[in-house]
Design a protein with these regions (language model features):
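Fungal secretory targeting signals
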Residues: 1-7, 469
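Aromatic/acidic polysaccharide-binding cleft in carbohydrate-active enzymes
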Residues: 295-369, 373-381
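C-terminal beta-strand-rich structural cap/linker in extracellular carbohydrate-active enzymes
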Residues: 441-469
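Solvent-exposed beta-hairpin/edge-strand motifs
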Residues: 414-435
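Carbohydrate-binding surface patches
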Residues: 378-420, 457
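N-terminal catalytic cores of secreted or lumenal carbohydrate-active enzymes
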Residues: 9, 14-192, 227
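Structural recognition of the beta-strand scaffold that forms the well-ordered cores
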Residues: 22-30, 66-72, 76-79, 136-140, ...
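Active-site neighborhood of glycoside hydrolase catalytic domains
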Residues: 172-191, 201-306
């Protein structure tokens, strides 16, 4: 039991004075891993429920994701009426070729123009996710269908810094995505919350020798495409589905792209998405300010890195919650090798390895900061806080990077900062190795304060009941 004598090397005061909107959720993209493993119920339990699941002989706490991003593929292996076929990058990784539904250059209205049987595994995982409570679904595109591109290569233009969507296919790309959204609603039982027609569009990493699908769009073209998509969704009775944009690679690119859109383009967008690959850099505040000035919210719709220890994840996630004020956060590859996956896996061979330490770091956020909570000011650069108004519960997640120390948490700015002497539940994960979502019942409130001893490189989550703003 932590002694009821105040002791701390650091103190942070949680403030309810400012809230940053309701938290919408945590999630994961389904491409590419679900195309390989989409038939596995245990993976669906692990990612989309908060149940404990036995996996490879180990009991794993479910992450409780409630957001999925479903990828509209760009690849097909049939021949167009003019005899053309898809051009495949010499460096393309086969498991990153996602099946597309629209047959090349065929009439939109005929049933034979669409092959709705492909991509069964990714759809299966989306359905499993829905049955486990997922309630935000985003349809996104890495590239238009290959036959809409200038070089028939869904990895990108021969020059990765040039547009690869043919000008006369801007609307066709929008039609493709809107048609999938309509099919999902009418036949799959899934209503997409949003549709994103772009993926890191201003970057130039895409190209004809790429290892994955990708397509460069200059900013004027992006503006046109989101307008087309808004109109195509509306024409199909899908006006409640948001258009999201632009999933730029970095925060700074996202700000520049958003500010470049004209009034019609901005009015067509219902939410701004960014990726988190600027990591510890970039001006998150500028993006937040630009987006909120337009009355919208921002998602970090894709984050990933190769650090299996969890150090980068917790550092960058805390930066997002403190400065970007995103209302959702989505991880890229749930299963992958080289440290990228939350679970180590070789998608090419279909083999699955161990759960990474960063999985357990992420669990400290996803299992406790839940949809509908309000993000508060944590009072320091190592603390984030969320408040559940219906349960009158405060969630605190904090990390200690330096030498082992006591950290004191001060709740005196709340009208009721818990109940003196009450138990504060806590969970702990150590970065790199050590504790993996370990649960402790040894921490108690002393007035409106409590403290805990943090080893070096340790992340903890605390739940405090009977807190009133």
């Amino acid at each position: 039991m932590h002694r009821l004598v105040e002791r701390a090397d650091s103190t942070t005061t949680i403030s309810p004075a400012t809230t940053y909107g309701k938290w919408e959720g945590w999630g994961v993209s389904l491409a590419w891993w679900a195309a390989a493993f989409g038939d596995q119920d245990d993976l669906a339990d692990i990612f989309f429920s908060t149940d404990w699941t036995t996996f490879n002989g180990v009991s794993i706490p479910g992450l409780g994701f409630n957001v999925v991003r479903y990828n509209a593929g760009a690849c097909s292996w049939n021949t167009a009426p003019d005899g053309s076929t898809m051009v495949v990058s010499p460096d393309m990784i086969s498991t990153r070729q996602m099946d597309g539904y629209w047959c090349p250059r065929t009439d939109l209205s005929t049933a034979s123009s669409w092959d709705w049987t492909v991509d069964a595994n990714q759809r299966a995982m989306m359905t499993k996710a829905q049955s486990r409570g997922v309630n935000y679904f985003e349809l996104f595109s890495n590239s238009p269908m290959w036959w809409m591109t200038t070089n028939h290569n869904p990895s990108g233009n021969d020059d990765g810094s040039n547009n690869n969507l043919q000008a006369w296919n801007y609307d066709q790309h929008a039609i493709y995505l809107a048609s999938i959204a309509l099919k999902a609603k009418s036949s799959w039982g899934v209503t997409f919350t949003s549709v994103e027609p772009l993926n890191e569009p201003y970057d130039s990493w895409t190209g004809d020798t790429g290892t994955q699908e990708g397509c460069h769009f200059d900013r004027d073209t992006q503006n046109e495409v989101v307008i087309y998509l808004r109109n195509e969704l509306n024409s199909r009775g899908l006006s409640s589905i948001l258009v999201s944009a632009s999933d730029e690679n970095t925060y700074d690119q996202a700000t520049a792209t958003w500010n470049s859109f004209n009034s019609t383009g901005q009015a067509s967008v219902g939410r701004v998405n960014t990726h988190g690959y600027q990591y510890g850099g970039g001006d998150r505040v500028a993006l937040y300010d630009a987006v909120t000035a337009s009355g919208l919210s921002v998602w970090n719709s894709e984050y990933g890195e190769d650090d299996a220890t969890g150090e980068q994840l917790v550092s960058n996630l805390i930066l997002d919650l403190i400065w970007l004020h995103n209302t959702a956060w989505v991880y890229w590859q749930a299963l992958d090798g080289g440290g990228w996956g939350l679970i180590d896996a070789d998608v090419e061979t279909g083999t699955i390895g161990d759960v990474s330490q960063k999985y357990y770091v992420l669990a400290l956020f996803t299992r406790h900061i839940r949809e509908g909570m309000y993000i508060l000011q944590g009072g320091s650069d190592y603390t984030v806080a969320a408040y559940d108004s219906s349960a009158e519960k405060l969630i605190i997640v904090a990390v200690n990077w330096g030498s082992a120390q006591y950290i004191n948490f001060d709740l005196s700015e709340f009208s009721q900062g818990g109940v003196d002497g009450a138990l504060v539940k806590r969970w702990s994960t150590q970065i790199g190795s050590g504790d993996q979502y370990a649960n402790f019942t040894d921490t108690y409130l002393s007035g409106t304060k409590f403290w805990s001893y943090f080893d070096e490189d340790t992340v903890m989550t605390f739940e405090v009941d009977n807190v009133v703003i």
